[in-house]
Regions:
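Conserved PLP-enzyme active-site core in the AAT-like
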Residues: 2-3, 13-15, 19-22, 82-245
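Conserved N-terminal alpha-helix of the aminotransferase class I/II PLP-enzyme fold
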Residues: 41-93, 115-122
Length: 245
């Protein structure tokens, strides 16, 4: 019986998502400074634009360099895929805007980064999305705050800046009992210290500016999907499960 090869955290952090260049054998990931890509045929182009096969069509959407980052963080988190963004706040906003719309509701820990609090408390209400803030130490408070229009539960692994510890397994149980996903900001802990998917979270986002980069000279963010939440079965997220008309 053959054994499935698995790699440790250090190996994944160095090599996940990247292969040596097949033409030159170069080990390091290049920075692909391109906006467009070459297609083998009209049929090949059509299959890419119709998302029938993997590949790149335009760097605003995907890029080979960015794809390495996305695959690497997804591997470190134990997720099925990731999307890189221009900042951590962009990652948070992307996750929420994908799942929620006007008339929807979020239950959030109140011990969260100030920028995220402002997004939830001031910006999103302009678009018809309301948030109820609760004590992160009390999973029952999350359950009590859920409304018929609630679409998402949210918290941070460690609250910024007070380092409040969220009981992710208990809050995820609350979310799943109501058919809802749990989104976690894991910026403070990174996959090295905490992997929220193993504790029941469904989505994770990071500000890559902090501990992921480790040097404070870049701005970036990522959203990672665990692959465990049944988006179709929940019946609450048609933007993910139904075609655009």
């Amino acid at each position: 019986m053959s054994k499935v090869k698995t790699f440790g955290f250090d190996t994944l952090s160095l090599h996940a998502g990247q292969q040596p260049d097949p033409a030159t054998g170069a080990r390091a990931t290049p920075i692909y400074q391109t906006a467009s890509y070459v297609f083998k045929s009209p049929d090949h182009a059509a299959s890419l634009f119709n998302v029938e096969r993997a590949g790149h069509v335009y760097s605003r959407i995907t890029n080979p360099t960015t794809a390495v980052l996305e695959e690497r963080i997804a591997a470190l988190e134990g997720g099925v895929g990731a999307i890189a963004t221009a900042s951590g706040q962009a990652a948070c906003h992307l996750a929420i805007a994908t799942l929620l719309g006007a008339g929807d509701h979020i239950v959030s820990s109140r011990a969260i980064y100030g920028g995220t609090h402002n997004l939830l408390d001031y910006t999103l209400p302009r678009f018809g999305i309301q948030t109820t803030f609760v004590d992160p130490r009390d999973p029952d408070a999350f359950a009590a705050a859920i409304q018929p229009n609630t679409k998402l539960l949210f918290g941070e692994t460690l609250g910024n800046p007070g380092l409040d510890v969220l009981n992710i397994p208990a809050v995820s149980d609350v979310a799943h009992a109501h058919g809802l996903p749990l989104l976690i900001d894991s910026t403070f802990t990174t996959p090295y210290l905490c992997q929220p998917f193993s504790l029941g979270a469904d989505l994770v986002f990071h500000s890559a500016t902090k501990f992921l980069s480790g040097h404070g000279v870049i701005i970036g963010g990522l959203v990672v999907d665990s692959g465990a939440f049944d988006w179709a079965g929940s019946g609450k997220f048609p933007t993910l499960t139904e075609p655009y008309e």
